Amino acid sequence: MVDISLKILSNEMKISIKELIKTLSEISISKTENDCISITEKKNLLKYLESKKKPFLNTFILQRKTRSTLNVFTPGGKNKSVQIEIRKKRMYLKNNKSELEPLLKNKNLLQNKEKNNLKSLKNTISKAKESQKNIDILEESKANINFKNLNKLTKSNVFNKNEKNKSLKKNINFNNHSFYSKKTIKNNTENQKLYKEEKKDYHLTTFIHNRNTEDNRDREIEKNKRNFHRNIKNYRQKKNNKQNNQIKSKKDEVRISKNRKNVKQKNKSILLQQVFKKPESVINRDVVINGAITVCDLANKMAIKSSEVIKNMMNMGIIGTINHVLDQDTAQLIAEEMGHKVILRRENELEELIMKDRDTGNNISLTRAPVVTIMGHVDHGKTSLLDYIRSTKVASSEAGGITQNIGAYHVTTDFGSVTFLDTPGHSAFTGMRSRGVKITDIVVLVVAADDGVKPQTIEAIQHAKEANVPIIVAINKIDKVDSNIDQIKNDLTKYNILSEEWGGENIFVLISAKTGKGIDNLLNAILLQSEILELKAISTGMAEGVVIESFLDKGRGPIATVLVQKGNLKKGDIILCGFEYGRIKVLRNENGKTLKHAGPSMPVEVLGLSKVPFSGEKVTVVRDEKKAKEVASYRKNKSREIKLANQNRSSLENMFKNIKKNDFSELKIIIKSDVQGSLEAISSALFKLSTNEVKVNIIGSGIGGITETDASLALASNAIILGFNVRADASAKKIIDLENLDLRYYSVIYDLLNEVKAAMTGLLSPQYKQNIIGLAEVRNIFKSPKFGLIAGCMVTEGIIKRNNPIRILRNNVVVYEGELESLRRFKEDINEIRNGMECGIGIKNYHDLNIGDVIEVFEVKEIKRIL
């Protein structure tokens, strides 16, 4: 065979000459670039390269990556996700002859660490001398291991002591080599001892079995992982695929490895799945409907989109949006149509529960004092009568001598206790008076002997009859000379008020509030009537009552005058009053005296409410303040919903109102009053003043003084501020003076109404009337270079004035309306001409005059209008 040059060999092997020379030097062959290589050297080179590429023929390497996400809390309170990747590499080896032959031939590697191995052998020999038994066992085990390994390597059966030491040295060197680990040799020696005792094969069968099972498990995990990623890749771009949901749910699985320290065990993977999964079928829910509900809220209760509900509504013939309010029955139909179970609840269920959970006492009714309402016309002496009974001077403190709000007084007389309600007499307080009738037992109708039956007297009779309340007629001012009692009795018979003397059921009492005459007879009549009515009430347990009056005190807060109807009202009780609630802090009577409790038919002032309640609201004592707050909030929201529903209700009438809404003027007013009753009365009276042309718009109202907020509102909306028994504070006065706002104070309601009426009159659109002042007949027509056509006319009626508008009549039909351009008699310009005279008339921008036309001259006058 011919030798081959290194250059040709390098080209065949596709490596550089320098790398080839370096590789030859590693197998103890020194060559240069120009040298040749023999066949044997080439074979050795190829064997070496093959052994270098595959140092172990039976080597199995596994690589594995595990990815997971770790949530880390940051100082800002947010979660930060950290991606973690764990990489594992495992190598499996099998000992055989072909693996160890190149190692034994490599002399350079064995000689480098020969000295260290000799030292270790000396140490082992010295230890073996100490105990002979241990030496024998150690020598036997070492000999067996070495012999068996050497049998496989060299296929020789006999080794001497030097060869045994060499094999030990080579094995130790092999341990230090990168291909074998100390751990592997140690396990091999231990397993060989076990197999020697059991006389089995030297292969580590159990160890291999464990490894194989673990490898199979790893292969299954890797296979599942590859399939999972393959499925994700296949379905990633399919947007509307049904399997996307399953893949997404798989993505949500988090793989976590639990690592145990110092435990030689395979890491176990745990799969944590997300709790929520999209339902595959429709879920039927229990939908609770309390009352009226919007489409959006109904959709939220059914856990579906609002568009689905609207689609179902359209299929049922109902058109609406997400803000459309559905009543309870309609919402029930829609929910049941969509397959849900509906649970209906009453709107006032919470209120009913809180009312049931009340201590009503022993249910023993006792006789109570009668509640008497004094009613009648203005200035007929109602307050003076009550004054005399109470022996106080209340009337002098009333503005203008007229009662402005309901006064409740508990009077103890020699004949018994009576509670009086003094309602205002004039028509503005109709609402207050009607509330007074609802809580009263007896009505005392005061009629002035010198004035007779008046409109408010008739109204009082109507209120009393509607409430089925007995009426006692008190004819006042009998001390006056011009009194006519029989005429009053006759007038009252028209309204079915008959005295007992005339065979009727009504008691008539003649009194004089000034002198006190007949007052005792009136009290006797009241108590007699109360005995007939058998007035009784429960005086124990939680109290109930009615708000007679309410106002805001600057130092004490909201104050309500409450008439107790049954039960015992005590300090510290939790009360529910309309939209308001609170705990009673102070109880006072009409004289300002502090009370600890109040029984039936007792009027008291209550402090401690959240806000000022409306007059006429029912007061109820409850147990739980939290529940009382919930009920008050529910009532407020319900009232707001009703108002919004009424505003949104479209009708033909509202449509026409919207069309004509710009055809009227508007008077904007801000009202501040001292008490709630007066505020309501003024508001209702002002609304009654509204007409089709002028509307009263109360943009703000309240109880208490005029504040800076009120002044700012008046400035922004160009409104008038009306103060009834209140004044403006310093900050409000500053804005009012600076902006020149209209602020007016009143103490009598009549003055307020009259001035508002005058202001509304000024807002009325003016009316105009046309008066015909003269007629002229066209007798001839002339042409003028300056004015065009000139009509020669004869004044047949009235006066023709130059500056007034005119109409041209032809056959009694108006053909033109305009104005005069010139008026002359002969050649002189004149301003007017009287009946029976001739004149020349030039008409502006009109040239179609005919002989026989009539020129009508008129004037426009403005007519003053009143409400």
Swiss-Prot record:
Residue ranges of region G3?
422-425
Name of the protein in question: Translation initiation factor IF-2
Q: Source taxonomy lineage?
A: Bacteria, Pseudomonadati, Pseudomonadota, Gammaproteobacteria, Enterobacterales
Q: Which family does it belong to?
A: Belongs to the TRAFAC class translation factor GTPase superfamily. Classic translation factor GTPase family. IF-2 subfamily.
Specify the tr-type G domain's residue ranges: 367-534
- Please state the gene responsible for encoding this protein: infB
Q: Where is this region: G1?
A: 376-383
Its source organism is: Buchnera aphidicola subsp. Schizaphis graminum (strain Sg)
What's this protein's function? Answer: One of the essential components for the initiation of protein synthesis. Protects formylmethionyl-tRNA from spontaneous hydrolysis and promotes its binding to the 30S ribosomal subunits. Also involved in the hydrolysis of GTP during the formation of the 70S ribosomal complex.
Q: G5: where is this region?
A: 512-514
